[in-house]
Each structure stands twice: as C-alpha cells, then as structure tokens.
Amino acid sequence: MGDEKPVIVMANRERDRELLIPVADSGDKDDGSSSKPSSSSSASSSSHQSSHETLSLFIRGWASKKFMTGCVILLPIAITFYITWWFIHFVDGFFSPIYAQLGINVFGFGFLTSIAFIFLVGVFMSSWLGASVLNLGEWFIKRMPFVRHIYNASKQISTAISPDQNTQAFKEVAIIRHPRVGEYAFGFITSTVVLQNYPTEEELCCVYVPTNHLYIGDILLVNSNDVIRPNLSVREGIEIVVSGGMSMPQILSTVDKPLASIDRATSL
C-alpha cells in the first residue's frame, strides 16, 4: 500500500502536466490573436495622425501664402496713401494756423494755399527779377560752412528732375559696360566732353552712375559710341534707381544717337 501511493501521486502529476500543457498552448494562441487587433489599431491611429498633420501643414501653408499675397498687394497701396496723407497734412500745416487765427477751420484750405504759393513762386522765379533774387540768396547760402553742402545736394536732386531742359542735370539715361566685360551699369548722361590729347579728337560722354543714393555715385567718361541709350526718360531712370531696379521694364530697346551729337562729331 505504501508503494501504491507514490505511484498514484506520480500518475496524478503526469495527468495534471498533460492537462496544463494544452492550456498553456491555448493561452499563447489567445495572446497572438489579441495582439493582432492591438497592432492594427495602433497602425490605424498612426496613419490617422499623419494624415491629420499633413492636412494641418497644407492649411497652414495655404493660409500663410494667401496672407503674404494680401500683404504684397496692400503694402504699396497703404504706403502710398500714408505718404500722401502725411504730405497733405505737412503742407497744410504751413497756412492752416493762419486760417485758425482767422476762425476758419476747414481742412484743406492750408494745402490749397500752399499749392498756390508754390505756383506763384515758380512764376516769379521764372522772371528776371526772381532769378536775380534767387542768385542773391544762393550767394549768401553758399558762404555758410555747413548749410551750403545740404543746399548743393538738394539742389542737384531738384535740378535732376527739373522740367527745364536747359538746366536739367540728367540729359539722358545711359547704359555702359562697367566695371568688367559682360557687365553693364545704369547711369545718366550729364554732359559731353571733347578729348584733344589724341591725334584725332574724341567725343566723350560724362556718365553719372549712382551707387547707393541718387546724389552719391561715380562719374565716368565714356566714348559716345560706346554708350547705349535705352528708350527710357529721365524720370523713369530715377524711378529705377530709387526702387533698386524693381521698376526696370523686362524689355529695353535702344534709341538712335541724338542728331546734335552726330552733327557735332562729324564737324570735328
């Protein structure tokens, strides 16, 4: 009897072991089947998240692009209106205090009075008496140490855009080959010079090439035959320089050499 009990116990243990093994296998199978749905759900969530990020990036890029387009369109309009409004207020401020003392507080009267005053000054300075007064005033200004430099610079700018062709500083717009071969510089013809050091006299054009500002630049003497004259007026050339070349037309065509210059060259 004592020997049968260990045998029975061993048999029970073997039976329990056989019963436990399938149970463990089935548990492993259940774990594998349950891991598949979890992995598929994580993959679907990651794909949904990536699509959401792509959509958000697209919306943000589209919105920023449209916003910058609106800024590009509205910025020059806003700057133009702001400068115009500031200029009207600035000019109106010269005579509006006089009207305010008289009890007239109508906006625009000072501006109209300033415009009329500028027109009358132009009419007066065009006469012989006005020119004499202007020369006398310039004589005093040019003897002031610091003021004369400011006056000369501002006068050069105003003379450059003067409608009087006789006193206009910039005669024509010019394009010259400078500083190296294959490169061109944009400038203005200010005068013509005849060089007599050579066996045959050579006509040179004095070309002013602005560097940073309109009143700062280099003066180059270029043969008149090497000067390219585009179909641009002086005002258009000044706009190109002030805008940093952004207002340059896409296509430029050249014009013929002025007849006066040709006749002068042939007479030499």
Curated annotation (Swiss-Prot):
Does the record bear Transmembrane in its keywords?
A: yes
Give TM segment ranges.
Answer: 71-91, 104-124
Ranges in the Cytoplasmic compartment?
1-70, 125-268
Any one Pfam family here would be DUF502
Which intervals of the chain are annotated as region Disordered? 21-48
Q: State where it is primarily located.
A: membrane
UniProt lists compositionally biased (Low complexity) regions at 34-48
Substitution effect: G130R: In cov1-2; dramatic increase in vascular tissue development in the stem in place of the interfascicular region that normally separates the vascular bundles, thus leading to an almost continuous ring of both phloem and xylem tissue around the whole stem, but relatively normal vascular patterning in leaves and cotyledons
Tissues where the protein occurs: Mostly expressed in flowers and stems, and, to a lower extent, in roots and leaves.
Q: Where in the cell is it found?
A: Membrane
What InterPro entries does this protein map onto?
COV1-like
Q: What GO terms in the biological process aspect are recorded for it?
A: stem vascular tissue pattern formation
Any one annotated GO CC term: Golgi apparatus
Q: Which residues lie on this side of the membrane: Extracellular?
A: 92-103
Keywords in alphabetical order, please.
Developmental protein, Membrane, Transmembrane, Transmembrane helix
Q: Which family does it belong to?
A: Belongs to the plant COV1 protein family.
| Name of the protein in its database record | Protein CONTINUOUS VASCULAR RING 1
